[in-house]
């Protein structure tokens, strides 16, 4: 975007933009012993979904409504192939934002749910903490690191333990 365009454009700041985490987020970051129970995308007769600790969690069309007309919104499960690339790829998201006149976006999780509930409800607390940290590292370094200032991270916390939550705030704050 040119400086002239930026100065003359009327811009919005979105404070509630959900990101659809790409399939590699946890598989690239979790220790090997957790790969089989950590979040990963599976495809079976029922379609494509996240699998975490043996629980199958589909992504609905409502979570991937970006770029669609209201009448196309659907609560039915969707695949990554059905989604607009800007739902899960940061450079494409920034291009979509620029086209829509959005200067900055506060980025919220989707699969981890509100405040990282998916990991708060994990059977294995160690795995839950590692998933929280993996998500935050990805969100800060990879997603928001693509375009600092335009993509703003909303971290998640291990809400089951106040000391772990404080430590995660300090750890992520140190990342910038």
Where does each model-flagged region fall?
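Helix-coil boundary/capping segments in enzymes
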Residues: 1-176
